[in-house]
UniProtKB/Swiss-Prot annotation:
Protein name: Cysteine--tRNA ligase
Originating organism: Moorella thermoacetica (strain ATCC 39073 / JCM 9320)
Cofactor binding comment, as recorded: Binds 1 zinc ion per subunit.
Alphabetical UniProt keywords: Aminoacyl-tRNA synthetase, ATP-binding, Cytoplasm, Ligase, Metal-binding, Nucleotide-binding, Protein biosynthesis, Zinc
Catalytic activity: tRNA(Cys) + L-cysteine + ATP = L-cysteinyl-tRNA(Cys) + AMP + diphosphate
Pfam families: CysS_C, DALR_2, tRNA-synt_1e
C-alpha cells in the first residue's frame, strides 16, 4: 500500500510501526456550529481509510478530537448567552447525528480539550523548561526560531509563513510567527489555573497533546483537511517534537478542499452548505458516494449535478443488491441451492478479478474513484448474470454477493446501517411469502386472486414482473 505523505511530498509504501496495528489521529471539528460539507469530507475520507485498513486485517486505533474550547465556541456562547461547554455539547450531539447519517463509524476515542487541561499544562511546562517556549504577561508562546525544522511540512519560507499564519499585532511576541500555547484569562471567558496564571490553552497545543497521550510519538497516520497543513499541523509537529525529541507522526494525509465557484467552502466566507440542509434534498449515502467519487487529494467544486449523479450511481448499486437479495431468497425458498446443478460460470472468477482491481486502486494512494469504477463493473457483471440465465450457480452467486457487500458496504460504507439491512431482509422475506401465495393461486387458475395481489402491491409501490425464472419484484 502506497500513500502520499505531505511531509515528504511523495508516495511512500505504508507499513505500520507495530505489525498488524495502525495508530491514526484525525483533527475533529471545533464545536460551535453544525458541520458543513467541507467538514464532512475528512470525516468520510478517513472513515473509509480506516474501514479499508480494517478490511486488510489491521487493528486500527482511531482517535478524533473535539475542540470544545476555542475563540469561536466562546463567541457563539456570548451570542446565545450560554456557557461555552453547553454550546459545545449541543454541537457534538449534532455532529454525531450527521456522522451517523453519513454512515461514519465511531472512532475508537473522541477526546475533548476540556477534559485534558492538566495534560496540556504539563506539555507547555515541558516546552518552557526545555527552552522552546517563553512567558509574556501571563501568555505562553512557542518560540519558532528555536525549532530549526519549522516549515518542513508546509514547505514554506519564513516570509510565506508570516503571510499565511493567523498573525495578530502583539508586542509580547519575540517573532510574529511565535504562536500561543497558553492564553491569559480574559473577563467572561472560561479559564483554569496554571503556573503562569489563570487562562486557557491555545488551539495547536490541544491536538498535539491529545495525540501524544493516546497514540504516543511516532504514530502511523495524522489526517485532516489541506487547510490545516499551515499553521495548525506545522505547529503540532513543532510542539510535539520539541517535547519528545522524537518524530511526531510518520504519514501526514490531507484531503482537498470543497470549493464553491472555485473558492474554498468555509464558514468565514459564508459560502458553505450545512450537511443537515443537504440531507433534506439528497439521500445521506448518495452524499457519501459523492465525497468518495473524487480522489481524496483533489478538490471538489460543489454543485447539484455531482450529487444527482451520485444519487443515480447509488441507485445502480442498490438495484444490484435487490437482484442479489431476490436471487438468494429464491434459492433458499425453493431449495435450489442443492437441486440446481452447478454450471460453468465466469462470475466467481470475474468477481475476484474486480476485487483485485479494487484493492489495487485503494493501495495506490487510496484511490476511491478507481475503486468505485471496479465496484460498478462488478454490479454490471452481477446484473448481466442474473438477467441472462434461468439456472443459477449458487457458489458463483455467493462469491459475487460476498465480494459486492464487502467492497461496497464494509469498505466504502455505501450500503447503509444494520437497521436498514434488517428492514430490507424483512421486506424480502415478506415478498417471498406473498409471491408464493400468488404463485399457488395461479397454479389453481385463481386469476382473480393473483391479479388482486399484483394490483394491491402496485398501489403500495411494488411492481411485479413475471420472468422465465419466476416472478420478480421491485420498488416503483
Amino acid at each position: 500500500m502506497y500513500l502520499y505523505n505531505t511531509l515528504t511530498g511523495r508516495k511512500e509504501e505504508f507499513t505500520p510501526v507495530e505489525p498488524g496495528r495502525v495508530r491514526m489521529y484525525v483533527c475533529g471539528p471545533t464545536t460551535y456550529n453544525y458541520i458543513h460539507l467541507g467538514n464532512a469530507r475528512p470525516m468520510v475520507v478517513f472513515d473509509t481509510l480506516r474501514r479499508y485498513l480494517e478490511y486488510r486485517n489491521y487493528d486500527v486505533l482511531y482517535v478524533q478530537n473535539f475542540t470544545d474550547i476555542d475563540d469561536k465556541v466562546i463567541n457563539r456562547a456570548r451570542e446565545e448567552h450560554q456557557a461555552p461547554l453547553v454550546i459545545a455539547e449541543r454541537y457534538i450531539e449534532e455532529f454525531f447525528k450527521d456522522a451517523d447519517a453519513l454512515n461514519v463509524k465511531r472512532a475508537t476515542l473522541y477526546p475533548r480539550v476540556s477534559q485534558h487541561i492538566d495534560a496540556i499544562i504539563a506539555a507547555i511546562a515541558t516546552l518552557v523548561e526545555r527552552g522552546f517556549a517563553y512567558v509574556a504577561d501571563g501568555d505562553v508562546y512557542f518560540e519558532v526560531e528555536k525549532f530549526p525544522a519549522y516549515g518542513r511540512l508546509s514547505k514554506r519560507t519564513p516570509g510565506e509563513m508570516r503571510a499565511g499564519a493567523r498573525v495578530e499585532v502583539n508586542t509580547s511576541k519575540r517573532n510574529p510567527l511565535d504562536f500561543a500555547l497558553w492564553k491569559a484569562a480574559c473577563p467572561g471567558e472560561p479559564s483554569w489555573e496554571s503556573p503562569w496564571g489563570p487562562g486557557r490553552p491555545g488551539w495547536h497545543i490541544e491536538c498535539s497533546t491529545m495525540a501524544l497521550k493516546y497514540l504516543g510519538p511516532g504514530f502511523d497516520i495524522h489526517g485532516g483537511g489541506a487547510d490545516l497543513i499551515f499553521p495548525h499541523h506545522e505547529n503540532e509537529i513543532a510542539q510535539a517534537e520539541a517535547q519528545t525529541g522524537c518524530t511526531f507522526a510518520r504519514f501526514w494525509l490531507h484531503n482537498g478542499f470543497i470549493t464553491v465557484n472555485q473558492e474554498k467552502m468555509s464558514k468565514s466566507k459564508g459560502n458553505f452548505f450545512l450537511v443537515r440542509d443537504i440531507l433534506k434534498r439528497f439521500r445521506p449515502l448518495a452524499v457519501r458516494l459523492y465525497l468518495l467519487a473524487t480522489h481524496y487529494r483533489s478538490p471538489i467544486d460543489f454543485d447539484d449535478a455531482g450529487l444527482l449523479a451520485a444519487e443515480r450511481g447509488l441507485e445502480r448499486l442498490e438495484n444490484t443488491r435487490r437482484l442479489l437479495g431476490e436471487a438468494r431468497c429464491q434459492l433458499t425458498g425453493t431449495g435450489a441451492e442443492t437441486t440446481v446443478p452447478a454450471r460453468t460460470s465466469a462470475l466467481a472468477g470475474r468477481a475476484e478479478e474486480l476485487r483485485q482491481e479494487f484493492i489495487s486502486a485503494m493501495d495506490d494512494d487510496f484511490n476511491t474513484a478507481r475503486a468505485l469504477a471496479a465496484l460498478y463493473d462488478l454490479a454490471r457483471e452481477i446484473n448481466s448474470y442474473l438477467n441472462g440465465t434461468t439456472t443459477i450457480d449458487p457458489a458463483a452467486l455467493r462469491t459475487a454477493a460476498i465480494t459486492f457487500e464487502q467492497l461496497g458496504g464494509e469498505v466504502l460504507g455505501l450500503f447503509g446501517q444494520a437497521r436498514q439491512q434488517v428492514d430490507d431482509e424483512l421486506l424480502s422475506g415478506l415478498m417471498d411469502l406473498i409471491l408464493q401465495v400468488r404463485q399457488e393461486a395461479r397454479q389453481r387458475r385463481d386469476w382473480a386472486t393473483a391479479d388482486t395481489i399484483r394490483d394491491r402491491l402496485k398501489e403500495l409501490g411494488i411492481v411485479l414482473e413475471d420472468t422465465p425464472r419466476g416472478p420478480r419484484w421491485k420498488r416503483s
